[in-house]
Amino acid sequence: MWPDNRIARDAHYLYRYDRHGRLTEKTDLIPEGVIRTDDERTHRYHYDSQHRLVHYTRTQYAEPLVESRYLYDPLGRRVAKRVWRRERDLTGWMSLSRKPQVTWYGWDGDRLTTIQNDRTRIQTIYQPGSFTPLIRVETATGELAKTQRRSLADTLQQSGGEDGGSVVFPPVLVQMLDRLESEILADRVSEESRRWLASCGLTVEQMQNQMDPVYTPARKIHLYHCDHRGLPLALVSTEGATEWCAEYDEWGNLLNEENPHQLQQLIRLPGQQYDEESGLYYNRHRYYDPLQGRYITQDPIGLKGGWNFYQYPLNPVQYIDSMGLASKYGHLNNGGYGARPNKPPTPDPSKLPDIAKQLRLPYPIDQASSAPNVFKTFFRALSPYDYTLYCRKWVKPNLTCTPQDDSQYPGMDTKTASDYLPQTNWPTTQLPPGYTCAEPYLFPDINKPDGPATAGIDDLGEILAKMKQRTSRGIRK
């Protein structure tokens, strides 16, 4: 028995914790009778006020072997890390590298979809509504650099002066040109844009000739083969060759790996990302230690996650914890948090080339955490759901406060859909003049008392069922 479930030692290490129950130090255990000369390695962990790991070091002989720092966005998702490793400098001494290796991360909700460093960018497409990876797309940084191009507005501004010099367009004109360029690239120029060009004495073909060519980078595409939990076991090329494979134990520890092509495959158990510098698996809200089969910090949701604050599912063969919160059934088949895994789908390699054509991101990697994910459009095209943003309660200022005011919005005139006949869902863009939306919401047709508590936009199983139901009625939103 360990006090507060904090393991102080095992067969390999000694552990220390702070007053918040966070692992702060892990040191090699020297067996009794063995004479050592302070050569044990010590791992140290440092956290911010939100209990997120922000600094890690590993030392031996009081000398640093590796150091890393981690950066998070306001939602607590890790968006970057810097790693310094011990190497020999110009004088022959061993020390930490002066220049760190920097890695950036891009997200789609709680799923990590993009990893980029100075050499390559790796994108992951997941099974809809789950954390099971389906497709891996790798693009070299050199290829990404070739995709850089000027926008149509920039091209015209740089050479639009009377003497061939630069000129500055008003923001409204830049916006119109950007919209026109996107329509030309999609081969769907609207009648409104055609009329605007005609009024200027221009044609679509003339504007298209002014645009920089679009470069399609070369990519390496692989299909994931996963077990029933969503743990990757192999990467298969578009030619059907297995170019990476691995074996793991029940807790996600790597037992054997065959990697002749030196592919970087860091996905472990659902929702987990392997950090080579520390040996830990980043698991969204916490870090998982596969050697112990538990987390290094306490559960951020407290007792809602179980009596043991450090516990990973005790039956990892049947249960997962893709969010680092709790082991229990979730809304999504293989998502939510602590969901029971479902059988992965049968992959179809013939579809890979067509999907890869859609993977050019319209934003730089350092904006990926806040930009919409490009893969989401695949599933929205199939969805029968209404993606309109509706308003549950809208308000505008009153001249005076009255006892009838809503207690949540004193001094405000408050309206809801029940104040009108017929009662219906009110889009935020169609509110009465002077009112602003105080409580917006999405998916009114699935957030009913008899429906699920939450809805994922890419929950494909529910989407297809609803599509079939509505098609049989002759109705399609």
Curated annotation (Swiss-Prot):
The residue intervals holding the sequence repeats read 9-37, 38-62, 63-97, 240-264
Q: Which domain of life is it from?
A: Bacteria
Which keywords annotate this record?
A: Repeat
- Pfam families the record matches: RHS (PF03527)
Entry keyword Repeat: yes
Region 4 X approximate tandem repeats: what ranges? Answer: 9-264
Homology family:
Belongs to the RHS family.
Q: What is this protein called?
A: Putative uncharacterized protein YbfO
Annotated source species? Escherichia coli (strain K12)
Q: What is the lineage of its organism?
A: Bacteria, Pseudomonadati, Pseudomonadota, Gammaproteobacteria, Enterobacterales
